[in-house]
Each structure stands twice: as structure tokens, then as C-alpha cells.
Amino acid sequence: MLSLFDPGTGRAEPLVPGHRGELRILSRGGPPNLAGLCDLLLPDLIRRTTEWHRLRVASAWAETGAGTETGAGVKNGSGAAFRQAASALNLRPPDTDDLGSAADVCTGGDGGPPADGRWTRSGPVTFPADLGGTGPDPLAGLHDRGLDPLALRLVLLGRRYRDPFTVTWPALAAAEAELASWRGLVADWANLPSRPLSAAHRGRIAAAFDDDLDTPAALTVLRDLAADAAVPPGARFETFADADRLFGLDLVRDVGRDG
């Protein structure tokens, strides 16, 4: 089960689904820009980790400002570019506009904890001035340089979500190269005899996510697995494909592609 930092106790506590065994996530909107977009990674990771344990999830994005917030932008035509950017980062859209009852966990926002449920938020992220562009597309700078938006997701997964963080162009370029390397390996492994996934590596990855979303530790396991010649290629393929349900990096994208 996922344990998430609780500001009330100062330690990670199990995140227990409430209503009928369903975890309800409310994401308070930020500005419809790059920072607001990246804030949505936290609820996405909470959702993925909860679903990993075969639990149901319902999510909603809240409006916390007069039409200038993420939730508002997503709900009207002016939010089309924002929705496309969220999709490019593999951030799942909300299930509903109204959860119908109190949320079990609320993320983001500047107004402090909600009346009900756990409250948590990401640490501030600083970006290069030319990364977000000046138009409605928060990922314009990445597109201008021909970079995969998921390179940004990988960079953000490399830090603990509560820590302040600075994104740099060199880090994005390195993430782009690592993604290409992993996808190439996965495509090669897919052509070799299948083997059962590595339960040990799978367990370590899941344990890292359960431990207050320790994504840096989970990435370390993935990197170790990629280089572990003792694990058959078919097992590495199955483990990478399975773990990508948590990482959301499209690691099997190049399987079956020529060249």
C-alpha cells in the first residue's frame, strides 16, 4: 500500500481508500502553464501506484481561481493546448468534475489543507526561461528543440516530489538519451525468447513507489536491471513493460518498429 507524507504527523502514513474502497483524489489547479502542468505529476503518480495495487481511483481537478487555474483551463476551449500537453506527459485526465463526496487526498493549491482528507503538494520546480515558451502550449520550448516531452517526465521522476528542484536543458538532453537507450533495449529484448519477469526487481520498484513515491530509488532499480546481464533479456523486457505502468515513460514505444 502507498504511504504518503502527512504534514499533520510529519511522517509517511498509509493512504487508505475511503468510500467503498475507492481512493478519491482532488487536484487543486495551478496556473495553466508549465509549473501547473508539472504539479499534476503528483496526483498521476498517486493514481498509478494505487491502481498498481488493484484499487479503484476517482480523480477530479478543482478550480481554485477565477478562471485562471488548471481546472478551469482544462474544462473550456482555451485549455485545449494544456490538455494536449498533459497527454504528452502521460498525465491522465480527471475522471469527473465532481467526486460526489470528500476526497481522500488533495494535492496542490496554496490554501492549506482541506477540511477532509490528506493534503500534500509538490516542491517548487524552477525551469529555464525558454522552456515553457510564451504561447498557450506549456511544452513549446521542448517541441522547438525536438525533445520528447517524456524526457521532462523522466527528469521530474529523478527527484523526490516534495523537494525543490531545478530543471536544466542538459538534464533534459540526458533524459532524452536515456529514454532512447531504454526503448532501444526493450525493442531488442522483445525479439528474444520470453521469460517470466524478475520478481525481485519488480518488488523493489513497487516498494520504492509505496515509500512516499520514492521515484529516484525506483529509477535506480530500473537502471540496475537494464545493465544486469544475469537477468535474461526476455525477463528484462517483461519487467520493464510491467514497471512502465508506474513510470509512464512509454518504454515499449519502439517495439515492432523497423530501424
Task: Annotate each predicted stretch with a short phrase.
Residues M1-A35, L42, W52-G259:
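Structural preference for alpha-helix termini/caps and helix-kink/transition segments
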